């Protein structure tokens, strides 16, 4: 009998061992929990500053007052909703029938002897000694505060506002960022940007603060010092979303400067649509022909992407060596011709698609990556902030080819939205020019915004009003003489 039990135990032990070995060989995969959404406590409220306190100190007084008004309004709205929800839940609970208390009474009766014993012990304790009666003189009154100067009073008032703003920001319903913007004259300005605003709204705010002309060439410019890449924000992009992709220790910067490349496409479309066709029209074109070309390219059933193709240098992954390949631009992405194949559609290989990708200009990549020339552009996902194998580097032979490829990618990615952005910028520039001619410094209010969530300075959501192509051409003649070039 004992031998049989020993055999059973041994068999059972062997079975457990085999099960352990089988489990280890299969490997148990752990299910990764999804990353939680960033709460207001984890959300970084500043870009370009050491901390939130420093950024609030950098705000102008009127901007700080406007921030406080917005925060108080947001929090009051949340409190009203909370009170309403509590009232509703209270009414629902009052309808529910109260449970019987018989069981509770029985339970308390069982505990009553313990309570009686505890009370008896308390009664046996001696009373505490009386407090000593000491005749101490009263403390001297505090010295009267010295009167504050006007500057000290203003500084204390601002410090109180900042302290309150720090508390309210964490309770606010709408995300707000204090952004340090580097100006064209090497100075900086601090702006409060909320999650409803697009680039066009921020540019309008900067126009009001700087009183500079509202040329269509002004832009917000994103610079990555570590990767040595840069690009301009498109006017319809949500600024807070873009900046939220930056890491907390990022050295990235936001610049406010003029870049003719931003809307060069609409001033001289022939340089992008006809340059590779060998036509004489690509050199000179009158205003009427330019307008017709833009209408044909952007206002038809679908947006026409420039027929762009040619040899480019491709940086190999993880190396500082470059290979020359033949690339073609299509609406869905960039394709290349494999070695020994033809340019027919069936032989083309997809290099990259534009969904969730941004295009950047490279800066000094000839030194950093041993590129053949300094005319480089880069394609990467917005959330990639460090060196990565998923970043694509391409190099062109000359500057004109570089601008053609970057502009062609923007057309393929954004389509007619790019043209709408330009028309809105031209309209804004025309209104600003009219105000300047009337001798007033008051900036013109925008006629419309590019997104339904965009907000004007007065807190109202503007109606989208885009000018016709004829109005754009007429306004552009007055504002930008370069259109005749």
Curated annotation (Swiss-Prot):
Highest taxon in the source lineage: Eukaryota
Protein's cellular compartments: Cell membrane; Cytoplasm, Cytoskeleton
Bias kind Pro residues: ranges: 125-147
Residue stretches making up the Ras-associating domain: 175-262
This protein's GO CC annotations: cytoskeleton; cytosol; plasma membrane
Principal location listed in the UniProt entry: membrane
Composition skew (Polar residues), residue ranges: 84-107
Keyword field: Cell membrane, Cytoplasm, Cytoskeleton, Membrane
Record's bilayer topology term: Peripheral membrane protein
Region (Disordered): 84-157
GO biological process terms on file: signal transduction
SMART domains hit by this protein: PH, RA
Family matches, as Gene3D superfamilies: Phosphatidylinositol 3-kinase Catalytic Subunit, Chain A, domain 1, Pleckstrin-homology domain (PH domain)/Phosphotyrosine-binding domain (PTB)
The PH domain, residue ranges: 305-414
Pfam families per record: PH, RA_2
Function: Appears to function in the signal transduction from Ras activation to actin cytoskeletal remodeling.
Family: Belongs to the MRL family.
Annotated protein name in UniProt: Amyloid beta A4 precursor protein-binding family B member 1-interacting protein
């Amino acid at each position: 009998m004992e031998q049989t039990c020993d055999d059973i135990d041994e068999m059972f032990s062997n079975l457990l061992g085999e099960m352990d070995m089988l489990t280890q060989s299969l490997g148990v995969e752990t299910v990764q929990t999804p990353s939680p959404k960033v709460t207001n406590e984890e959300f970084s409220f500043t870009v370009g500053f050491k901390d939130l306190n420093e950024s609030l100190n950098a705000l102008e007084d009127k901007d700080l007052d406007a921030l406080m008004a917005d925060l108080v309004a947001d929090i009051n709205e949340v409190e009203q909703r909370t009170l309403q929800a509590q009232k509703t839940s209270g009414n629902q609970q009052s309808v529910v029938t109260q449970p019987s208390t018989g069981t509770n009474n029985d339970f308390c009766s069982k505990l009553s002897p313990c309570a009686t014993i505890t009370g008896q012990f308390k009664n046996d304790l001696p009373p505490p000694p009386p407090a000593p009666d000491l005749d101490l003189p009263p403390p001297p009154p505090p010295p009267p505060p010295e009167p504050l100067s006007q500057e000290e009073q203003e500084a204390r008032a601002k410090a109180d506002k900042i302290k309150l703003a720090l508390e309210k920001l964490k309770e606010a319903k709408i995300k707000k960022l204090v952004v340090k913007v580097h100006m064209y004259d090497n100075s900086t300005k601090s702006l409060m940007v909320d999650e409803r605003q697009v680039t066009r709204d921020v540019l309008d705010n900067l126009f009001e603060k700087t009183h500079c002309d509202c040329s269509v060439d002004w832009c917000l410019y994103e610079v990555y010092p570590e990767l040595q890449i840069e690009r301009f924000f498109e006017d319809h992009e949500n600024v807070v979303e873009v900046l939220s992709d930056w890491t907390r220790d990022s050295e990235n910067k936001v610049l406010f400067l003029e870049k003719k490349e931003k809307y060069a496409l609409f001033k001289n479309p022939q340089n992008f649509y006809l340059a590779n066709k060998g036509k004489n029209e690509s050199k000179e074109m009158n205003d009427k022909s330019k307008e017709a070309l833009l209408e044909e390219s952007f206002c038809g059933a679908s947006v026409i992407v420039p027929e762009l193709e040619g040899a480019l240098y491709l940086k190999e992954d993880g190396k500082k060596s470059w290979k020359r390949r033949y690339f073609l631009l299509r609406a869905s992405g960039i394709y290349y011709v494999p070695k020994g194949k033809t340019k027919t559609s069936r032989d083309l290989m997809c290099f990259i698609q534009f969904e969730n990708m941004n295009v950047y200009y490279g800066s000094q990549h000839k030194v950093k990556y041993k590129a053949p020339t300094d005319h480089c552009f880069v394609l990467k996902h917005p959330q990639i902030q460090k060196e990565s194998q998923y970043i694509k580097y391409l190099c062109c032979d000359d500057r004109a080819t570089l601008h053609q490829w970057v502009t062609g990618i923007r057309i393929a990615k954004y389509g007619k939205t790019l043209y709408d952005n330009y028309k809105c910028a031209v309209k804004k520039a025309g209104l600003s020019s009219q105000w300047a001619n009337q001798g007033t410094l008051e900036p013109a209010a925008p006629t419309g915004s590019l997104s339904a969530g965009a907000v004007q300075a007065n807190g109202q959501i503007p109606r989208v009003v885009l000018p016709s192509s004829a109005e754009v051409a007429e306004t552009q003649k007055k504002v930008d003489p370069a259109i005749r070039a």
